Amino acid sequence: MLKQESNDIGSGENNRARPCDTCRSNACTVYCHADSAYLCMSCDAQVHSANRVASRHKRVRVCESCERAPAAFLCEADDASLCTACDSEVHSANPLARRHQRVPILPISGNSFSSMTTTHHQSEKTMTDPEKRLVVDQEEGEEGDKDAKEVASWLFPNSDKNNNNQNNGLLFSDEYLNLVDYNSSMDYKFTGEYSQHQQNCSVPQTSYGGDRVVPLKLEESRGHQCHNQQNFQFNIKYGSSGTHYNDNGSINHNAYISSMETGVVPESTACVTTASHPRTPKGTVEQQPDPASQMITVTQLSPMDREARVLRYREKRKTRKFEKTIRYASRKAYAEIRPRVNGRFAKREIEAEEQGFNTMLMYNTGYGIVPSF
């Protein structure tokens, strides 16, 4: 829209403000990024109110120190808008100036920059107010509102002030408090999980304050209780007299636990024979030997035993006798008396016919014939 023209300013004119690029009569007060032009108030209102596209141009005011460059930072201590060169020059003069808090200046869009000057000052003050956030004028439109919020989300730091409007200098206070709350919640969570684990393992909780009674459960068997006692041995040092409860509600006052003698609360009197218990190292659990593993270790032979067995087997094989053994003598005797036909066992009918034939022969001949089987 506008074309920036070069301004040849001599060394003697460096102290004067830069003139407007349009009228060249008034000092410039606004810099338009879209047109790359320095404009005065009247020219800015005339140019950027022509149409809606021109009203969306982003403009910033000119540096209040040199009045020859667009302002980039707002110094809260000096309440001045400075360009990059003037900001580095002013705030590097002494250590006190380095502590001034500066915030970037956002471009402003609208029909007239002069009508938005008050809004711009209010928005800059709101940026540094801890109880408010960045205020975006509704006249900027949806696009300007979105851009301003996006830039403010990563450009503007969070500044904290106390009631006397003084900077407390602790920018990490909120993060530190959040960290403390997180640690306390994690400690509470760990304590809750630990107490629940103790309840599940039948280990009574201790309050570490004075004498207390320790309820014990006797529903489990002796072996299971001993196993649980070996698995859960915590390094808890305490000294007090324990009072034991059984299932019937009776109290057993005979058990006394000392902080120098034991480091774990016993679960029942069935596994506790004396008041002192040897403390086992952490992470060690005594397991009962497996019978199957014992049998496997017994059946495993050494090479010498195996060689001796092989030799005995070979000697026994040399003297082996291949004889026919009779397993059932009664069956053998019955088989011998059964009739046979051509070497095979005959049926009862054939046997009866042969017996009748033999009887007839004996009657005819007058003497008996001994049959041969």
From Swiss-Prot:
It comes from the Eukaryota. One of its GO terms (biological process) is cell differentiation. Induction: Expressed with a circadian rhythm showing a broad peak between 12 hours and dawn. Higher expression under long days. Residues 109-120 have a biased composition (Polar residues). Transmembrane segments: none annotated. Its main location: nucleus. Keywords: Developmental protein, Differentiation, DNA-binding, Flowering, Metal-binding, Nucleus, Repeat, Transcription, Transcription regulation, Zinc, Zinc-finger. It is found in: Nucleus. Residues 121-130 have a biased composition (Basic and acidic residues). A zinc finger (B box-type) spans 15-57, 58-108. GO terms for molecular function: DNA binding; DNA-binding transcription factor activity; zinc ion binding. Zn(2+) 1 binds at residues 20, 23, 43, 48. Expressed in leaves, shoots and shoot apical meristem. Detected in the vascular tissue of the hypocotyl, the cotyledons and the leaves. Restricted to the protoxylem and phloem in young inflorescence stems and to the phloem only in older inflorescences. Also detected in the vascular tissue of the root. Zn(2+) 2 binds at residues 63, 66, 86, 91. GO terms for cellular component: nucleus. The GIGANTEA-CONSTANS-FLOWER LOCUS T (GI-CO-FT) pathway to control photoperiodic flowering under LD is conserved between Arabidopsis and rice, but the regulation of the downstream gene by the upstream regulatory gene is reversed in the two species. In Arabidopsis, GI acts as an activator of CO, which in turn activates the floral activator FT under LD conditions. In rice, GI activates HD1/CO in a similar manner to that in Arabidopsis. However, under LD conditions, HD1 suppresses HD3A/FT expression, causing the suppression of flowering. Belongs to the CONSTANS family. The CCT domain is essential for the interaction with SPA1. This is Zinc finger protein CONSTANS.
